[in-house]
Amino acid sequence: MEFTIKTATPEKVRTGVLVVGLFADGILPPAAHAVDKASKGKLAQLVKRGDLDEKAGAAVMLHDLAGIAAERVLVVSLGKSAEFSDKAYRDALNSVAKALASGVAKVAAVAIADAELDGRTLAWRLQQATRQIADGAYRFDAPKAGAKDAKKERGARKITLLIGDKVSDELEAAVRRGQAVAEGMALAKDLGNLPGNVCTPAYLADTAEALGKQFKFDVEVLERADMEKLGMGSLLSVAKGSHIPPKFIVMHYKGGKSKAKPVVLVGKGITFDTGGISLKPGAEMDEMKYDMCGAASVLGTFKAIARMALPLNVVGIVPATENMPGGNATRPGDVVTSMSGQTIEILNTDAEGRLILCDALTYAERFKPACVIDIATLTGACVVALGKIPSGLLANDDDLAAELLKRGTESGDRAWQLPLWDEYQDLLKSNFADMANIGGRYGGTITAACFLARFTKAYKWAHLDIAGTAWVSGDAKGATGRPVPLLAEFLVGRAAAKAD
């Protein structure tokens, strides 16, 4: 999908479909006002007659509108003007994205970013529009026969974003950012949606190496023998049950100054999670292919920042393995030694994400990071606590947590902070090791993060639990690409702060 910005009067633009937004109470933003005037009040009539629902995102398609050069005009409700918010704007954009993805026209002009929104610049509105329209065009048909031919036939190919202001470098950069984030989300979705027999640890490693080759950044892939030499006994305890070899992937994006400390992203890469000997129930176990969505988000974020040529140093770490039962699998009650030297009693082999992450977090120390963020589909408890709207956030540094919360709000990929209090650490006590890998029935998201916190004392660290946000179930089953928007926005903000 190709995006361009153009300063133009919307009623004179020749295109397959022209998109304008208006408020349910009859207030018309500039583009809608111009179309209404040229069509002799047709848009105002829609509102007056109640033909357009008040809810943001409701839409009506008008064909061959007199006085308008476009073949069709898609009129999208922005909701009530007094209630116009980030959510209302995004709801409207989702409606636009669905319409354009349906194949209503191959060429479209979108004039919806002219609606003023408190605290949001035109650049922000254009970036959101680009990202959501591009993301809305995503389809995953890879395993289906005829998928390539079907993909060619669907959706708008060229989108012109119409504005009343002069096109500037800032606005063009905003559109490029939106495209880059959408590309990163698409990669994360593709990896998440692939079945476990395809998206193996080796597949993730190959994907990382292909990205490195495309964007010219370094990639290292450590094998089982390398992990053994490093003393990654915790990670390797998870890999024991599978005949598929684990991989430890390290990506080095060097966009900043040579001596600048990097941001380190660590993504959980369990390519299929049966639970191991602590076997999961069979129902919906197919969705455990999504247990590598943390890894997918790191790879997707790397694609986004590389596409943006972000002036920042970033290291990506992906510990990747399956968690399978087998004759050589780890047993409940086994004690292993992590790379940090701390010992762990494994009371539940289905609490394996923290076991691979802890060694990756110890490995991250060697980079002397500015901060470390790990991303993991870690606990079902997070879904119980927060549902499927925000990701869970826990951190050992309040400023880092606040920064992530802010970037989540800006990107629409929000998180909610949970406590990381010392009192929870007592729940991880073990009679036979330095710690247990589970903390009991209550506060599971917090105790999982408390476990990880024991391996992050050397740096500022935040943990994103994306168990509720990485994918959706039901008829629309599929990976969401989250939290690529949050991570990308965070890194853009970090790069901007260094430039100031």
Swiss-Prot record:
GO terms for molecular function: manganese ion binding; metalloaminopeptidase activity. The gene is pepA. Binds 2 manganese ions per subunit. Mn(2+) 2 binds at K268, D273, D291, E352. Pfam families: Peptidase_M17, Peptidase_M17_N. This is Probable cytosol aminopeptidase. It is found in: Cytoplasm. It catalyses: Release of an N-terminal amino acid, Xaa-|-Yaa-, in which Xaa is preferably Leu, but may be other amino acids including Pro although not Arg or Lys, and Yaa may be Pro. Amino acid amides and methyl esters are also readily hydrolyzed, but rates on arylamides are exceedingly low; Release of an N-terminal amino acid, preferentially leucine, but not glutamic or aspartic acids.
